[in-house]
C-alpha cells in the first residue's frame, strides 16, 4: 500500500504544517463558505449604545443565565434610556473615535444593507377548477333554503334533487299544479306576476288546441279556452248554481266533431271562466243561493219583470251566435221542462252571468 502511494506526487500535499499554524492562531481549521464571506464583509462602526452594551450584555448574561437574548436586549434598551447624558458622554466619544478610524481604514466604504430573505407567503386561494365544478353542481340542484351556503357546506351536505333552472315553457305547460310550482320554481329568479282574469282569458286564446278544425267553434265570439284550468282557486258560491246538461245543446252541432266534444268543451268553458273570475275580490254582499231554493217560485216571479227577460227566454227567435255575452254562453233549458221551471232557471243563470260579466268589465 505504501509503495502505491509513494509512486504518486499528490501525496506530498498531505502536509499538516498549515493546519497547525491555523490552529496556533486560534482559528477553526474547517470554515464554511458563509463564514468566509462574513469575514470579507466590512462591518459598520459601532455606535454609542453598541459600545456600552458590549460589556453590559456580558454582565447581564452572567447575572441571568436563563434569560433569552431577546429579553436581555429589552433590559439593555431600558437601561440605556435611563442613563443621563453625562453618563452617555464617554460612550458617545468612543463611538466617534471608532467612526473616524473606520473612515481612515476604509475610505471607499459604502453601507450596503443585507437583503432579508422574504418568506414566501402561502396564499390560501380556492382552486378555480373547484369553484367551477361547484358552480356547475349548484346549477343542477335546488338548495333547501334561500340562505347562502359556502362551498364546504355544499360538499358536506351533498347534492340536492330537482331541477334548478326549469325553462319558461315548463312553467306555461304545467300551470295547474299551483302548489308544485312554488317548490320547483328556481330561487334567485323573479317569479312572474299574477295575471288578472281578463289577461288570462286573452292568453288562453293562443294556447288552446283541439282535435277539430277551426270551424268547430264559430259561435263563441272568437274566444277559445284551454281545457285544463290555470288556477286551483274555485268559486265556491258559483258551484251551487244549477247548470242543465240535458235538453237542447248550447253550441250548435258541427258535423265534423264527435258528440263527446260538446260536453267536454261546454264543461271546460264554464269551469275555466269561473275559475278566473274566482281570483277577483268578492263583491260586498254575496247572493245566498241556499235561500233561493227555499223561496217559492211564485214569489220570485212576482218580484221580476218578465218582459225584461223575453230576449233570453225566447231562444228560438235569435241566432245562436247572439247567445253569448262577453264570451259567456247563456244557459237555457230544454223545451220538455215546464215553462215556470224553464223561466226560473234561465232567469237565475242569466242574471248571474250578467252580474259577473259587468263586474269583471268594470
Curated annotation (Swiss-Prot):
GO cellular component: nucleus
Sequence segments annotated as region (Disordered): 21-41
Source organism, top-level taxon: Eukaryota
Tissue: Expressed in the embryonic pronephric sinus as well as posterior cardinal veins.
Primary location group: nucleus
GO molecular function, one term: sequence-specific DNA binding
Compartments reported by the entry: Nucleus
Ranges of the DNA-binding region feature: 42-110
Record's keyword terms, sorted: Activator, Developmental protein, DNA-binding, Nucleus, Transcription, Transcription regulation
Entry-linked PROSITE patterns: HMG_BOX_2 (PS50118), SOX_C (PS51516)
Biased amino acid composition, Basic and acidic residues: 32-41
Domain Sox C-terminal: 245-362
Listed Gene3D superfamilies: High mobility group box domain
Protein name: Transcription factor Sox-7
Biological source species: Xenopus tropicalis
Gene behind this protein: sox7
